[in-house]
């Protein structure tokens, strides 16, 4: 991979550290405020979800219309300045309002930066190296995911929320610099022309028409969205692991094994060919991992099901994005990516809502999910 690809991977890692610092610090600080904090935390999380649903479709349009490099620089700079500003607030009431406001602004920024970040890859990485890039990026992000909670805990334990916000601002500024040194001339930027509100909705419609008529792309979105639905339900079940298995620390063990599975998956993903048949194979194998967790096996053997599941899900995710980045025309890439993100955000609360509707959480729920995944796989085949 070239130097620019390394810069983008570094930006992804830096942003991941900053986001985990921000979410951990804010959530712990709000939760420490008792009943009021619980209510505010709910508003904090819901505001992010709703904003993401509303902004994602527009983010794809902007990504296809304008310089993706400038979009990333702008969002990083805005978020960095915002975190820096609120880090100096000392009044708790003002801090609560500022955190909610900042969370909404960051959700808007991420709605624009996510599709731009995935789409710009095709401008700086050779087509045949995209799967390798995605695998390396996922490996770095998974390692950061394992290490960041410990780092976040130490920062909050020995410093304060204000220091957490300052560090988060620093990560945004570093990300800004990394993007600023990418090539200034993108491989393909649309001609500069007048851009109105009507054009936004026209572009969204054109993007949806493109997805509908490109059957292979439509199939990819269908598979990715359905997997997001099933695994949102799966993630809802995991916090109940201690009670389901009757083992203290089961949840932490399952998460640790899942992280190991993700890292291993990222290591081998670029060794596999990217094709529709491979995606369906990965999907059914991920389901096998879920199935293992529902079997009456010794606890730690059941826990290993999450290692299997995350191993194949990670490879699946890498190859889904590789397929999208290599098959979608550059003029539509941002809109296709934003559609994936929008559907993912939409399906997550639906899946979790269905799980709360169930009369009880039982081990059989894992088996039921595997049955659903297998049925979906059979229908696609």
Residue ranges of model-derived segments:
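Juxtamembrane intracellular "pre-TM" segments in multi-pass secondary transporters
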Residues: 1-2, 185-221
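MFS 12-TM fold signature
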Residues: 78-86, 106, 171-175, 283-290, ...
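A single, central transmembrane helix in multi-pass transporters
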Residues: 13, 161-163, 203-264
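C-terminal transmembrane bundle of multi-pass solute transporters/carriers
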Residues: 56-58, 65, 69-71, 75, ...
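Helix-loop junctions on the cytosolic side of multi-pass membrane transporters
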Residues: 119, 123, 161, 165, ...
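Substrate-agnostic recognition of the 12-TM MFS/MFS-like secondary transporter fold
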Residues: 7-24, 44-61, 67-82, 98-156, ...
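Transmembrane alpha-helix termini and helix-breaking/packing motifs in multi-pass membrane transporters
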Residues: 27-36, 90, 147-167, 244-245, ...
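Helix-loop junctions at membrane interfaces in 12-TM secondary transporters
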Residues: 88-102, 294-306
């Amino acid at each position: 991979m070239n130097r620019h690809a390394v810069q983008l991977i570094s930006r992804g890692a830096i942003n991941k550290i900053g986001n985990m610092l921000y979410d951990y610090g804010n959530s712990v600080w709000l939760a420490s405020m008792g009943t009021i904090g619980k209510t505010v935390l709910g508003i904090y999380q819901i505001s992010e979800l709703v904003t993401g649903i509303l902004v994602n479709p527009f983010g794809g349009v902007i990504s296809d219309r304008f310089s993706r490099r400038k979009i990333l620089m702008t969002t990083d700079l805005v978020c960095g300045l915002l975190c820096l500003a609120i880090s100096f607030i000392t009044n708790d009431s003002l801090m609560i309002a500022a955190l909610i406001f900042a969370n909404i602004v960051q959700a808007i920024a991420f709605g624009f930066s996510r599709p731009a970040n995935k789409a710009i890859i095709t401008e700086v990485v050779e087509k045949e190296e995209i799967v390798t890039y995605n695998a390396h990026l996922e490996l770095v992000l998974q390692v950061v995911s394992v290490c960041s909670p410990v780092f976040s805990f130490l920062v909050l334990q020995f410093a304060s929320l204000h220091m957490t916000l300052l560090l988060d601002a620093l990560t945004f500024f570093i990300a800004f610099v990394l993007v600023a040194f990418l090539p200034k001339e993108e491989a393909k930027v649309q001609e500069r022309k007048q851009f109105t509100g009507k054009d936004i909705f026209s572009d969204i419609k054109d993007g949806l028409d493109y997805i509908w008529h490109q059957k292979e792309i439509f199939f990819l979105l269908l598979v990715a969205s359905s997997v997001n639905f099933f695994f949102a339900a799966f993630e809802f079940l995991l916090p109940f692991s201690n009670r389901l298995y009757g083992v203290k620390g089961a949840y932490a063990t399952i998460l640790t094994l899942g992280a190991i599975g993700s890292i291993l998956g990222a290591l081998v993903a670029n060794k596999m060919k990217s094709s529709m048949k491979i995606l369906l194979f990965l999907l059914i194998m991920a389901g096998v991992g879920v199935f293992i967790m529902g079997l009456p096996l010794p606890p730690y053997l059941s826990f290993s099901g999450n290692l299997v599941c995350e191993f194949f899900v990670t490879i699946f995710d890498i190859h889904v994005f590789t397929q999208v980045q290599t098959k979608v025309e550059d003029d539509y890439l941002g809109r296709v990516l934003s559609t994936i993100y929008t559907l993912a955000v939409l399906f997550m609360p639906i899946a979790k809502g269905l799980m709360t509707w169930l009369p009880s959480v039982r081990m059989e729920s894992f088996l039921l999910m595997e049955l659903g995944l297998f049925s979906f796989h059979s229908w696609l085949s």
